[in-house]
Amino acid sequence: DSDDERRLSVVLEEDAEVIRYIKPPLNQLGLFYKAAKQYNPDFLVETADKKYMIEVKAANQTDNEDVQEKAKAAIKWCECASQVDADGKTWEYRLVQGDKIVVGNTFKYVIGMAIPVVVDGE
């Protein structure tokens, strides 16, 4: 785990709008990309109105092809999860640049700084 992820954990712990969060165990989500490789996001976060899949990356890694392929697969996973979520909440994916995570900021602020991901055809 990176220091960026540690700082995000602190933000999540301190934000009253965050109901719960987890760092998912390896290979538990069934999230695949590129020739059956498994992707494990850094965090799953629930707020009162939404659920989020969060990936934290260093600024110099956000444009990496592998990171972008994982992001596209995660966006599709979130679209499917939104349709069957038992709580009726929408799932959203966020790619967060590690240097944008500052202890003391809110979770909403952190995800507002997320890197846009373009899915083919959109």
Regions found by a protein language model. Name each.
Residues D1-E122:
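Electrostatic, structured charged patches in enzyme active sites and in nucleic-acid/phosphate-binding
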